[in-house]
Regions:
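Acidic anion/phosphate-binding donor-loop and adjacent secondary structure
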Residues: 89-92, 108-123
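Short aromatic-enriched loop/helix-cap "lid" or pocket-rim segments at secondary-structure transitions
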Residues: 26-31, 36-37, 94, 114-117, ...
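Conserved nucleotide-sugar donor-interacting segment of glycosyltransferase catalytic cores
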Residues: 1-45
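A structural signal for the hydrophobic beta-strands that form the central parallel beta-sheet
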Residues: 82, 103, 134-135, 163
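A short beta-strand/loop micro-motif in the catalytic core of glycosyltransferases
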Residues: 15-19, 73-85, 102-104
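Conserved donor-binding/catalytic core segment of Leloir-type glycosyltransferases
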Residues: 81, 125-143, 149-153
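Glycosyltransferase donor-sugar binding loop
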Residues: 108, 135-138, 160-168
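Membrane-proximal helix-turn-helix segments that form the acceptor-binding/catalytic region
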Residues: 8, 39-80, 93-95, 99-100
Length: 168
């Protein structure tokens, strides 16, 4: 209903912020680990990511893809925003490629979040180390946990990896 209204009103300026790939695939919010690029033409046939977030037991992936393409394309006066160059590049390879895409990185309000004195390096005995910080709500392969584990095996003793978030 929303996109039908937006198409009927080209005089309205529209800005749509994408935070993942769901808008231009038949199902997937993220497809990189499945190494699937069907979304660049048409999601059809077997979906290697069907049991991943967002999980589905239904096989309406091709019809979802076609429905999204029909609904989301052809909206005049719309700009897409992504929080990364990577996502912008993915959008530019999708059926949304005809829209202007701008990158606006996620920001930090420095009036709320500011550097404060801390003894955290002393507490964990890493005062002399260079810290590589990783932050994720939940750590898993998709968020790069395996990469951090591999990195930790190859770093010199001058470095310490600090990960913040939850993991199994």
């Amino acid at each position: 209903i929303l996109f039908k209204y937006l198409k009927a009103h080209p005089e309205i300026k529209k800005i749509w912020t994408l935070h993942d790939c769901w808008a231009f695939t038949g199902h997937c919010a993220y497809y990189t680990y499945a190494k699937c690029d069907k979304w660049q033409t048409c999601c059809n046939g077997y979906c290697p990511n069907k049991k991943e977030y967002p999980k589905t037991i239904f096989s309406k992936i091709e019809s979802n893809f076609n429905r999204k393409r029909k609904i989301f394309c052809g909206v005049e006066n719309m700009i897409l925003i992504t929080p990364s160059k990577w996502l912008k590049n993915e959008v530019n390879h999708s059926f949304l490629r005809n829209y202007e895409v701008m990158v606006i990185n996620n920001g930090v309000d420095t009036k709320v979040f500011k550097s404060t004195p801390s003894n955290i390096k002393q507490k964990y005995n890493i005062e002399e180390k260079k810290v590589i910080l990783g932050v994720a709500s939940v750590w898993d392969k998709r968020k790069g946990l395996d990469t951090f584990i591999d990195l930790s095996k190859n770093l010199s003793s001058d470095y310490k990896i600090v990960l913040i978030g939850l993991s199994n």
